[in-house]
Amino acid sequence: MKRFCSLLLALTLILSLGACGGSPATPETTQSSAPESVSAPEPSSPPAENASSEAALEKTGKTLRVAALKGPTAMGMVKLMEDAARGETANGYQFTLAGSPDEIVGSIVKGEFDIAAVPTNLAATLYHKTQGKVQLVALNTLGVLYVVEAGDTIQSVSDLAGKTIYSTGKGSTPEFALNYILEKNGLADSVSVEYKTEHAELAALLSQGQAELALLPQPFVTTALAQNDKLRVALDLTQEWDKAAQGASQLTMGCIVAQTSFLEENPAAAAAFLAEYEASVAFVTDPANLDAAAALVVQAGILPKEPVAKAALPHCAITFVAGEEMKKTASGFLEVLYNADPKAVGGALPDDGLYYTG
């Protein structure tokens, strides 16, 4: 009932709005750089007349500062970004796209973002680090990790023994998920892992033949495969996680966090965001919208070409899970990580205060 009321409120606000233009995001490079701040990508068609950016602000009185990572977390937001550019949202929005979590963690801790899309384990770490000033509000990405190989020697996890895997995500979900699977398979001491800063950097190394074995998330798996026909997906870490966890948890890669003060002081804006973001995810994940969603992903600078975006989107495990279901799923995942390595969740299993259920 709460979600229905929130959605009804957001829809009522949205229907009274006009439209406005925005600025396109800069395409991602393979080098680590400062995160990009953009109002929103340009709308894909001309906005309606008699519109202004102030129209949205008159409804909630709030411009939300939103950060996301260049990958599935941002891909689920692209329709919201376009709607914001048209002025068709209840909130004003300023989006920041980053290449890695390290680029935005400091700003989240300082309260410089109202909302951010981050790895799920990082939500727990931020909750501890800020003494409860950051809360988990929704899950947005399930399992998207794959081991990609230049060859055909890896047929099972046991084949990783004695190998070196290149990966990204040190200190976040990819590292701890891989470590958990290796530990459960008795390979913790027989596999070396070398970390790179950004997914795009690692995908480029694979494509150029400079790495033979890598752990990558979508959509960068699709990007690498499209650029080098000698590459193949060797292992799906979601399947390997399920085998290791034996039903105890679900691999949950990404989530939405928000400042506790923002949630408490701006309940209408928070409810409107959740409704607008859920609608964006529904649009992006609808097969009927694949062409349009791929165009928006490229328009936002997340991926360089529409064919790659179209190939990647169905495999990005983009989702929206909020409320009690979010709490149940996330808590099970974090408990598994904690039991495997307490530092994965900031040293202690978070209490129920982590979860914002509306």
What does each of the following model-derived ranges do?
Residues A34-A40, P46-A188, V193-E194, E212-Q218, ...:
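Short, glycine-/small- and polar/acidic-enriched structural segments
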Residues L263-A340:
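Secondary-structure end/capping motifs
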Residues S331-G358:
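Conserved C-terminal helix/tail region of periplasmic/extracytoplasmic solute-binding proteins
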Residues A84-N91, G162, Q239-S249, T319-K327:
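Short, solvent-exposed loop/beta-turn-alpha elements that line the ligand-binding surface or hinge
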Residues G18-T29, V38:
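Bacterial lipoprotein signal-peptidase II cleavage site
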Residues R3-S23:
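Sec-dependent N-terminal signal peptides of Gram-positive bacterial secreted proteins and lipoproteins
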Residues N121-L122, T130, E194, E198-L296:
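Pocket-lining segment of extracytoplasmic ligand-binding domains
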Residues K79-M81, L145-S156, Q250-A268, T319:
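A bilobed periplasmic-binding-protein/Venus flytrap-type ligand-binding module shared by bacterial periplasmic
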